[in-house]
Design a protein with these regions (language model features):
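Catalytic machinery of carbohydrate-active enzymes
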Residues: 1-112
Length: 112
């Protein structure tokens, strides 16, 4: 019997250096959870680079729209929600990601 892979979301916006320093966290999560797909939520400027990481399976772009642009924000939340993540590692821990936490189905949410 083949086990279904868990989906885990990692949220990391921010500067290039911060994202590169997070690579060790990506590696650790990938090794601690067996049979897992790691998805990274980050800015569009880092998408192509992060897809080169052997630890990241998918990248979802979050261009951090203004809070009054609810249509785009909820479109992103819906995209995230359809992937049914079992865990979310929130490395950003911001007001924006707190908003995501409120509206997403209830995965296990881990913040820094």
């Amino acid at each position: 019997m083949k086990l279904r892979k868990q989906n885990i979301l990692i949220i990391k916006h921010g500067a290039f250096g911060d994202l590169i320093q997070s690579d060790g966290i990506f590696r650790t999560i990938k090794h601690c959870f067996s049979n897992v797909n790691l998805t990274l939520l980050t800015s569009s400027s880092y998408k192509d680079l992060m897809l080169l990481s052997p630890y990241i399976d998918k990248v979802i772009v979050d261009d951090r729209f203004k809070f009054w642009n609810l249509k785009k924000i909820f479109r992103l939340i819906n995209e995230i929600d359809t992937l049914c993540f079992s865990h979310v590692f929130d490395l950003q821990n911001s007001q924006r990601t707190f908003l995501y936490k409120i509206f997403l189905r209830k995965p296990t949410w881990i913040t820094t």
